[in-house]
Amino acid sequence: MDLSTADLADREGPSVRSCDVQLRNYGGRAVFSGRIRTVRCFQDNALLKQVLSGPGEGDVLVVDGGGSVHTALIGDLIAELGRSNGWSGVVVHGAVRDSAVLAGMEFGVKALGTNPRKSTKTGEGVLDEVVSFGGVDFVPGEHLVSDTDGIVVVASAD
């Protein structure tokens, strides 16, 4: 999608679905978009690693980590899995780590903050269900656009 989040907000008007949570850019690609896939997990990244290990086809993985910054859900190794498997980027309602490496990676990464502490790896979590944060429902199959102004979700890429 070639429209910026500001242009999408103007087009959608008062009904625009823009994320109110102020997520920071950590990846080397500040502008990214794609079809939404979702993971809900809390301080455990095994499931999202599994998802990013598969073909991304330009999709964006939205991770609802419950807003916890106690442990990082994504670091350089998992981000590289996503990048090399064709994912456009990840949006994490939680923390990341290896931020200096992420900044040099041609991959979109947005998150609440950083923490060097690694997460558990039990595989707890849920795939491809609607996740909600920042006043937005992230619906699998809908389209997400992320840039330096924020995140907007639209029903389709048209």
Swiss-Prot record:
Cofactor: a divalent metal cation
GO molecular function, one term: oxaloacetate decarboxylase activity
The UniProt record lists the keyword Metal-binding: yes
EC number: 4.1.3.17, 4.1.1.112
Gene Ontology biological-process annotations: regulation of RNA metabolic process
CDD domains: RraA_family
Cofactor: how and how many bound: Divalent metal cation.
Protein name: Putative 4-hydroxy-4-methyl-2-oxoglutarate aldolase
Annotated organism of origin: Saccharopolyspora erythraea (strain ATCC 11635 / DSM 40517 / JCM 4748 / NBRC 13426 / NCIMB 8594 / NRRL 2338)
